């Protein structure tokens, strides 16, 4: 996963595109 994202999950899930 990436550190870029609006959601908190995006931190470990990756950028939500």
Curated annotation (Swiss-Prot):
InterPro entries the UniProt entry points to: Pyrokinin_CS
GO cellular component, one term: extracellular region
Keyword GTP-binding: no
GO biological process: neuropeptide signaling pathway
Domain of life, per lineage: Eukaryota
MF GO annotations: neuropeptide hormone activity
PTM sites of type Leucine amide: 17
Tissue-by-tissue expression: Expressed in abdominal perisympathetic organs and abdominal ganglia.
Keyword Magnesium: no
Family: Belongs to the pyrokinin family.
Keywords per UniProt: Amidation, Neuropeptide, Secreted
Subcellular localization(s) per the UniProt record: Secreted
Record's protein name: Pyrokinin-5
Ranges in coiled-coil conformation: none
Predominant location category: secreted
Function: Myoactive.
């Amino acid at each position: 996963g990436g550190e870029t994202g609006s959601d908190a999950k995006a931190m470990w899930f990756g950028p939500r595109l």
